[in-house]
Amino acid sequence: MGLLVSRALRIALLLGLVAALAGIYLAFLRPWHARWGASDGEVARALPGDELWPDPARVETRAITISAPAEEVWAWVRQLGQDRGGFYSYEWLENLARARIRNADRLLPDLPERTPGEKLWLASPEEWGGTAFVLVARNDPGRALVTLTHVGADEAPVGTWAFVVEPLGPDRARLLVRSRAGRAAAPPRHGWRLFDLLVFEPAHFVMERRMMLGIAERAERRLPPGWRNVAEVATWMAALAVLLAAGLSALWRRAHPRPFLLFAAAGAALLLLPTLRPPLAVSAAAAALLVAAVPWSFGGRRAPGGLALGHVRLPR
């Protein structure tokens, strides 16, 4: 009986911490990343492709200014795709999902413009049953590339994904990326919506922002060393590993609050490091502190008298 109450309390505490982190994300981080880099005017105005998906349930508009001619930016946009130049994002993460992507660091010669109805591959056609693609719906060369997104090869479209390049003079351009998804009038699917909010949306933002930065780096000819992306992702993986270790420790150790404290710290790091993307030195220091705290979290003694956080000893 005492053990059952103890374990139930520990599970409730962990779920409470997860709910608190999710609440912080939904209240503060999600509204920010849904319009990362975009002005009020850019968020409000129509962009190419909006007409293909009216009345969406969700709209995200992100933007970045690139110090390169619009023609140069477009050249990198039009070779997006696993079948062309990749997505200029976290190649290592993409290939963990069997995408078989190799990001190009140079413009590929003699690429034709995309045509409506063409598949733009997100992963190799040989992976994921050949379903990892979006369909080109509109292509205005030099200006806009709009795709229809699908869940599976035979499924109806679920939204649009648009890339718009606007000149800001001879040597600068604005890249806008807009996603429109779902139907506002559709009946809610709460389980899928929760997954979309807490898993797909933040993951999509992290990858899409890196793609936009990757386009800017290539157009401006200032590519960072390849190890930086790997090191950045490694700090997130370290935070995830510490989160799992602390969670298991909190579930199975009844004596001390330290695993709960480390679980909260690792959860906050896993929430903030990929989303806010601080300088690599800051991310590395945070990850190192979390890893160093793992032995500390396993320490501590049971409080005298039989009562400690996460453990209730019933009287004999």
Predicted regions mapped to residue ranges:
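Glycine-rich portal/gate segments that line the openings of hydrophobic small-molecule binding cavities
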Residues: 8-15, 45-57, 65-72, 78-174, ...
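Hydrophobic alpha-helical membrane-embedded or membrane-associated segments
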Residues: 11-21, 237-241
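Selective detector of the "anchor" transmembrane alpha-helix that sits immediately C-terminal
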Residues: 231-251
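N-terminal Lys/Arg-rich, disordered targeting/topogenic segments
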Residues: 1-7
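A conserved amphipathic terminal alpha-helix motif
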Residues: 181, 185-230
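Short acidic N-proximal helix/loop "leader" segments that mark the beginning
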Residues: 16-59
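Short hydrophobic alpha-helical membrane-embedded segments
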Residues: 235-239, 257-266
